[in-house]
């Protein structure tokens, strides 16, 4: 289906462009949200008559969006979730969760404005784009952690999984050393034991 865009649409075109899209996308998104008109002869004439007004409205909306973007850009949103020892979430963080977290911060955006390729399924950080306006974008950092303390460590750049592995390795080393060392042994006993071992080795 060919449509006339009434505003800039990411990865599709600018205001006034005639583009070809799938019927479902046109009906369920572009036409439904007032972002486009069917590219009929009648609508082409209609667009020509409303072009000036659309451009004025777009400039106003863009200015307001820029103010909102200033409040959003650079925000660090923390979302606490349960996860396994390996950092795999028991569930996932979706656009709905991010929109809700922004709302708690006093920022209202709709789900289509948040660009998330796939649900977040592990702890860590991810930078996301929020399309405040077709021509204005802001960026937020989403930190997913098991606790507020862990979120702070992630923000500091600590590798949570590596820290846990290091602790496990250290514990194993201590346990292994304990098999060859008796803390209750007398110094002479230790020396004798060492001497016997050396003799056996020879």
From Swiss-Prot:
Coiled coil: none annotated. Residues 181-191 have a biased composition (Acidic residues). Pfam families: Ribosomal_L9_C (PF03948), Ribosomal_L9_N (PF01281). InterPro entries: Ribosomal_bL9, Ribosomal_bL9/RNase_H1_N, Ribosomal_bL9_bac/chp, Ribosomal_bL9_C, Ribosomal_bL9_C_sf, Ribosomal_bL9_N, Ribosomal_bL9_N_sf. One of its GO terms (biological process) is translation. The keyword Amino-acid biosynthesis does not apply. The keyword Nucleotide-binding does not apply. Residues 177-202 are annotated as: Disordered. GO terms for cellular component: ribonucleoprotein complex; ribosome. Keywords: Ribonucleoprotein, Ribosomal protein, RNA-binding, rRNA-binding. Gene3D superfamilies: Ribosomal protein L9, C-terminal domain, Ribosomal protein L9, N-terminal domain. GO terms for molecular function: rRNA binding; structural constituent of ribosome. PANTHER family: 50S RIBOSOMAL PROTEIN L9. HAMAP family: Ribosomal_bL9. Binds to the 23S rRNA. Belongs to the bacterial ribosomal protein bL9 family. This is Large ribosomal subunit protein bL9. It comes from Nitrobacter hamburgensis (strain DSM 10229 / NCIMB 13809 / X14).
């Amino acid at each position: 289906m060919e449509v006339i865009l009434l505003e800039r649409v990411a990865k599709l075109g600018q205001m006034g462009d005639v583009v070809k899209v799938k019927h479902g996308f046109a009906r369920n998104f572009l036409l439904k949200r007032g972002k486009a008109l069917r590219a009929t002869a009648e609508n082409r004439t209609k667009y020509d008559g409303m072009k000036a007004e659309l451009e004025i409205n777009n400039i106003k909306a863009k200015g307001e969006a820029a103010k909102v973007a200033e409040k959003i850009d650079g925000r660090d949103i923390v979302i606490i979730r349960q996860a396994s020892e390996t950092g795999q979430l028991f569930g996932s963080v979706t656009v709905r969760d991010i929109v809700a977290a922004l709302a708690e911060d006093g920022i209202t955006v709709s789900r289509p404005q948040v660009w998330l390729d796939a649900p977040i399924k592990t702890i860590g950080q991810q930078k996301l784009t929020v399309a405040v306006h077709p021509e204005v974008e802001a960026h937020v950092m989403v930190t997913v952690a098991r606790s507020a303390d862990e979120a702070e460590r992630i923000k500091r750049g600590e590798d949570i999984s590596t820290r846990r592995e290091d602790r496990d390795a250290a514990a194993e080393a201590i346990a292994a050393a304990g098999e060859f060392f008796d803390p209750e042994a007398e110094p002479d006993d230790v020396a004798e034991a060492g001497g016997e071992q050396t003799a056996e080795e020879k």
